[in-house]
């Protein structure tokens, strides 16, 4: 059955891997939101399976108006429903000392990583409820094990990033409780080999942290694993915080 999938932050890293993975699935319309569609030639050149197509939409996740406008433009492309939304856009990086970090730094992470997916959910909810796939629509928030209070002792100093992901997890849990007609969960993709992750790793090393044991998966591998979880999603997954292998993570 034809499917419509929306992925934020689709121009690089895991987002691009997700776009490529869904475009390789027949009869799939992929809506990739990006900050500047004119600079996404590599996305447009991705291989497409029979019946699949790509729509690039400009969206800035820190702006409620931008999110509302972007979702509003879908009607002009005859898109009246969405089956899967993956809130992938985000920022990451270490914070050397939370006590010394300005509130503005913490707010920047929260605006992108927590409030962004929250505002996106509100904007796409009518389209998710209009899904005619025969199954419940899905909203997946790409989170991080760094947002787990139980796991924070094993991480490099990512207090601002971790706090924003912990807030995102809380919002996802509450949205799932409020909207039982949609399957909603927070998804840890694992350690994905992206430019953003490498930049954070280099900075952490410069601060003296030994991360030699850390291993990465490719964006494509991670995207395939996430798609497999989405394809098999059940109502029981809603409101949970899942690891890359589908096991449940502690909040």
UniProtKB/Swiss-Prot annotation:
SUPFAM superfamilies per the UniProt record, alphabetical: NAD(P)-binding Rossmann-fold domains (SSF51735)
Pathway the protein takes part in: Secondary metabolite biosynthesis; terpenoid biosynthesis
Entry superkingdom: Eukaryota
One Gene Ontology term, aspect cellular component: cytoplasm
Positions contributing to NADP(+) binding: 14, 33, 60, 88, 122, 161, 165, 192, 194
A Pfam short name: adh_short
Entry keywords, A to Z: NADP, Nucleotide-binding, Oxidoreductase
A GO molecular function held by the record: oxidoreductase activity
Catalytic residues in the record: 143, 161, 165
UniProt xrefs under InterPro entries: Fungal_SecMetab_SDRs, NAD(P)-bd_dom_sf, SDR_fam
Biotech use: Griseofulvin is a spirocyclic fungal natural product used in treatment of fungal dermatophytes.
BP GO annotations: terpenoid biosynthetic process
EC number: 1.-.-.-
Enzyme class name: oxidoreductase
Keyword NADP: yes
Record-stated family: Belongs to the short-chain dehydrogenases/reductases (SDR) family.
Record function comment: Short chain dehydrogenase; part of the gene cluster that mediates the biosynthesis of griseofulvin, an important antifungal drug that has been in use for a long time for treating dermatophyte infections. The first step of the pathway is the formation of the heptaketide backbone by gsfA which is initiated by priming with acetyl-CoA, followed by sequential condensations of 6 malonyl-CoA units. The resulting benzophenone can undergo a spontaneous dehydration to form norlichexanthone.
The protein, known as: Short chain dehydrogenase gsfK
């Amino acid at each position: 059955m034809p499917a419509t999938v929306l992925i934020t932050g689709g121009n690089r890293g895991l987002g691009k891997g997700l776009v490529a993975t869904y475009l390789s699935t027949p009869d799939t319309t992929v809506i990739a939101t990006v900050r500047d569609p004119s600079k996404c030639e590599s996305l447009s050149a991705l291989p497409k399976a029979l019946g699949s197509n790509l729509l690039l939409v400009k969206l800035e996740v820190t702006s409620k108006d931008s999110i509302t406008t972007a979702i509003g433009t879908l009607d002009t492309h005859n898109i009246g429903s969405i089956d899967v939304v993956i809130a992938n856009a985000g920022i990451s990086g270490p914070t050397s000392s939370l006590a010394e970090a300005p509130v503005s730094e913490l707010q920047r992470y929260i605006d992108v990583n927590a409030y962004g997916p929250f505002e996106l959910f509100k904007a796409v909810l009518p389209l998710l409820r209009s899904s005619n796939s025969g199954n419940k629509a899905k909203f997946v928030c790409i989170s991080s094990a760094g947002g787990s209070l139980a796991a924070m002792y094993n991480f490099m100093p990512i207090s601002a990033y971790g706090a924003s992901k912990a807030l995102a997890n809380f919002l996802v849990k509450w949205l799932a409780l409020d909207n039982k007609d949609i399957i909603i969960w927070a998804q840890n993709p694992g350690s994905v080999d992206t430019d953003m992750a490498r930049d954070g790793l280099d900075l952490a090393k410069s601060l003296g942290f030994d991360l030699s044991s850390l291993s990465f998966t490719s964006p494509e591998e991670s995207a395939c694993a996430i798609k497999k979880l989405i394809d098999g999603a059940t109502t029981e997954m809603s409101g949970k915080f899942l690891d890359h292998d589908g096991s449940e993570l502690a909040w």
